[in-house]
Each structure stands twice: as structure tokens, then as C-alpha cells.
Design a protein with these regions (language model features):
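Pyridoxal 5′-phosphate
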Residues: 1-408
């Protein structure tokens, strides 16, 4: 595995050459990444050349449909799943609400779902609301000091009543990467399906969902350098078991069964630009010329290697500061570069102070109220969150550390 060519990477993102953004280092990537040029090019082309109803007989319509199909096929291949096991919806939260409705119709009285208090609300609230329909909700709780999930605690929650286990690949404030394959195996052994929220993990390298093994995997394309779409993998066995949520005449198309809303044609088509970007990085760094899953895995490891190298010095500089509590582990190899800090004063005010030092970051609860409460964080203060990705430069890291020295 070689070293990431950071200049090549940043050249793929027009934001880095945008005059209005010069001098500002972007550290709110967990809220939405910059968009890569292949996605912008495809979106512009669609809106200028293909803005018609797709799948018709005339050229513009035919090409529109082909580009939508291309996006699904290429992204599914990177994720290691079948093409029709990937659906696009308006957002991850919306996709989860649709799934919860399907489970509500499928489950029987007395059935149970396991949720965590480590999740973003998108993979928590929709499931918890099913208690109103008579289903049992069991909470897999984090350690209040570390924020970690203990596998034995999960095993203690499982029995023949549990139909679904929901958890994050990593939390959007705690950052620790959960062992998806191991957790999935435990849940499957107990007869439960598995739903993984990958929103905070996928920006750091698309996972091989097929190898990981969950029945549902969710992430948001606008955080993975793409357009504003929620990407949802539902493996065939579960997708064909759950009741259809779309128009009745679309029930036979697996990728349509859980997307009742009309598809956003242009943004789905533009999602193929994420696959273009993966291929650009793979080929530029002399990666494998094999199938898309192999190329995706190569780029995943390339991204993670870069991020870990940049993240560890940040964690080292923060972890022993007075009046600063690092949320989650200080080991960069075990977490995503999404770093939340509990401070002695209001985090939004600190984020405002950072603007004066050219740092774009955020403060608040980031829809992760449950994990912050469980860890004893004062919600009136919230947390300061600094988050980055593989395209962040060493110069920007230095700028961040200098700014934190000045404001903390």
C-alpha cells in the first residue's frame, strides 16, 4: 500500500480551488463532505442534457435511465452486493423510517428489536417508535466512560423474541469503529436480522458490505463526496421477506420495494461519480485492475492509512488537555477521524471562535443526544466536533492544532 497523493486527491475537489473558501480549513466533514468533480460533472450533464423522464425511447430519456442504472450497478459492485440490493432514497433517516414501517407490518406481537444508545437518531428513533405498536425495544447501552459497546451485553439481550439488531458502524460523536462482522454473527446466531448505520464510516472508505454480512447497511452519499441521497443495501433474503412499501406494481423489483417516493433521477445518476472517484484514486495509485469490489477495498485502505496518520497526532494533542474531555478512544486505528470534545463552555461559541482562525467546525449535539446523555455530557454545552477525511492536508491539521491552542 503506497502513500496517498494528497495533491492529486485535492485536485478532484473544486472546493479546494474556490476563492471564497481559501484560507479556511474544513473540519465539519461529518456533517457533509465536499463533492468530488466527477459527481458535479455528472449532475451538471444530467440537468443540462437529460432532464426528462427516464427510460423512454428517445435518446435523452434512454441515456437518463442508463445513467441511473449505471450508478446503482457500479456502487453495488464496490459494496460487494448484487445490483438490485442497493436502493437510493431521499436520506438515511427517511430510508430507516420506511424500513421501520416494513418491520412493523412483518413482526408479530411480543417480538423485540435491539437498538443502541450509541447511534445517531436516524438508526434509533424510527425503531424506538415501534413500541407504540406493541413491540418490545431493548437498549444495548454503551459504557458511560468510554462510549464503547460490549458484545457480552448484546448477547445478554438476545433471545428468540428478537427480530432485529440495530447499531452503528461507528458513532458520529464517539467515533469508535464497531466490529460489524462479529456483532452480525452474534445476532444471526440468535435468529435476528441486522441493520447497520454506516453514515459515519462510509466517508472513510466504502466497506465491502457483502463480506461484513449485515442484512441492511445504510449511508449518506452527501457525506461520501456525492449528491444528497440515502444509500440503502438490503440483502435479498430480507428484502423479499419484508412487505413491499412501494406501489404494488413495483413489488417484484427489489430495489424499488423500500423507496415509495419518486426517485431523484439526477442525483441518482450523479452517484456514479462516486464510483468514478474510487477508480481515479485506484488507478492513479497503481491499484488492482480487477473487479470493482477489489478497487473499492484498495481505496478504502488507502484512505484509512492517510486518515490514521493524520488523526493520531490530533488525538495525542487533545487527550491530556485540562478542561477538555475527548469522547471515545484515543487510538486512531480504532476510530474514524470524527473527534468530539466536551468542554467547560458552550461548544457552539468555541466553534464561532475557531472561525477567526480559519477553522470550519461545529458545536452542538449532532442528533446524537442519546450517546452524549449516556456519557454525562452537558447538552446545554454540547460538544465541539472536528472531523476530517483523506483529503485533509497536513497543513490543515497544523492549522487546526494551532487554532485549538488559541481558543481552548
Amino acid at each position: 500500500m503506497g502513500t496517498l497523493d494528497i495533491d492529486f486527491v485535492r485536485a478532484q475537489f473544486p472546493a479546494f480551488s474556490e476563492p471564497s473558501l481559501q484560507g479556511q480549513a474544513f473540519f465539519e466533514n461529518a456533517g457533509g463532505s465536499y463533492t468530488c468533480k466527477p459527481v458535479l460533472d455528472r449532475l451538471t450533464r444530467y440537468y443540462t442534457q437529460r432532464k426528462v423522464q427516464p427510460y423512454g425511447p428517445y435518446d435523452a430519456s434512454r441515456l437518463a435511465g442508463e445513467e441511473m442504472d449505471e450508478a446503482r450497478a457500479r456502487m453495488a459492485a464496490i459494496l460487494g452486493v448484487n445490483t438490485d440490493e442497493l436502493s437510493f432514497g431521499p436520506s438515511t433517516t427517511q430510508n430507516t423510517y420506511v424500513l421501520a414501517q416494513a418491520f412493523r407490518q412483518w413482526m408479530q406481537p411480543g417480538d423485540a428489536i435491539v437498538v443502541t444508545n450509541q447511534d445517531h437518531e436516524a438508526n434509533s428513533g424510527p425503531w424506538r417508535r415501534l413500541v407504540e405498536d406493541g413491540f418490545e425495544i431493548r437498549e444495548w447501552q454503551i459504557d458511560p466512560e468510554t462510549g464503547s459497546l460490549n458484545l457480552q451485553d448484546l448477547e445478554n439481550l438476545l433471545d428468540e423474541k428478537v427480530r432485529l439488531v440495530c447499531f452503528p458502524h461507528c458513532s458520529n460523536v464517539i467515533g469508535e469503529i464497531n466490529p460489524v462482522t462479529e456483532i452480525t454473527a452474534i445476532a444471526h446466531a440468535a435468529g435476528a436480522f441486522v441493520c447497520v448505520d454506516g453514515v459515519s464510516y462510509a466517508p472513510h472508505g466504502f466497506p465491502n458490505v457483502g463480506d461484513l454480512g449485515p442484512d441492511i447497511y445504510l449511508f449518506s452519499a452527501y457525506k461520501t463526496y456525492g449528491p444528497h441521497q440515502g444509500c440503502m443495501v438490503i440483502r435479498r433474503a430480507l428484502g423479499e421477506l419484508l412487505p413491499n412499501q412501494a406501489h404494488y406494481f413495483n413489488a417484484d423489483a427489489l430495489y424499488k420495494r423500500f423507496t415509495p417516493a419518486g426517485p431523484d433521477h439526477a442525483q441518482i445518476a450523479a452517484s456514479a461519480g462516486m464510483a468514478d472517484y474510487v477508480d481515479l484514486l485506484c488507478y492513479h495509485h497503481n491499484g488492482p485492475k480487477g473487479n470493482a469490489t477489489e478497487r473499492g477495498a484498495f481505496v478504502h485502505d488507502l484512505m484509512r492509512g492517510q486518515e490514521v496518520a493524520l488523526l493520531q497526532p490530533v488525538l495525542d494533542a487533545i487527550k491530556d488537555r485540562n478542561a477538555v474531555r475527548l469522547i471515545g478512544t484515543s487510538d486512531a486505528t480504532r476510530r474514524a477521524p470524527t473527534v468530539a470534545l466536551s468542554l467547560s463552555r458552550n461548544a457552539e461559541a468555541v466553534a464561532t471562535d475557531l472561525v477567526e482562525h480559519g477553522i470550519m467546525a461545529g458545536g452542538g449535539d449532532f442528533y446524537a443526544v442519546r450517546p452524549l446523555q449516556a456519557m454525562g455530557v452537558d447538552l446545554d454545552h454540547g460538544v465541539l466536533r472536528v472531523s476530517f477525511t483523506h483529503y485533509t492536508s497536513q497543513q490543515e491539521i497544523d492549522q487546526l492544532l494551532g487554532a485549538l491552542d488559541a481558543v481552548l
